[in-house]
Amino acid sequence: MFAVYANSMSQTDPMSGLVIGDRPEPEVPEGWTTVTVKAASINHHDVWSLRGVGLRQESLPMILGCDAAGFDEDGNEVIVHAVISDPDWVGDEALDPRRSLLSERYQGTFAERVAVP
């Protein structure tokens, strides 16, 4: 599928690691669903990721993008929330010490489809 992703990171030239091309369809963990992305926005988080902040080398290639709007598998319009908490966490996911954002541990929203909880 068509995607925009980080293939490498650079403190001095972050955009050099940005690639536009094909990536595999998202792997969908049990209990998650797939969203067909219709709109996504670039955030400063994406630039920091290309600089190597919050993104580990062993996670590359990583589809960037934290938020999106689109359609779920049933055709419902949805807005994708970027914060992913631990499955065992109860309460505000922003307070979960094991939380992450899409495009840190899980492939992000700059693609035709994204897997989300």
Regions found by a protein language model. Name each.
Residues 1-4, 33:
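Short structural boundary motif marking the start of a folded domain
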Residues 10-20, 44-46:
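Short N-terminal binding/cap micro-motifs at the start of the first secondary-structure element
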Residues 97-98:
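Extracellular C-terminal loop/segment signatures of secreted glycoproteins
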Residues 109-117:
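Glycine- and charge-enriched low-complexity intrinsically disordered segments
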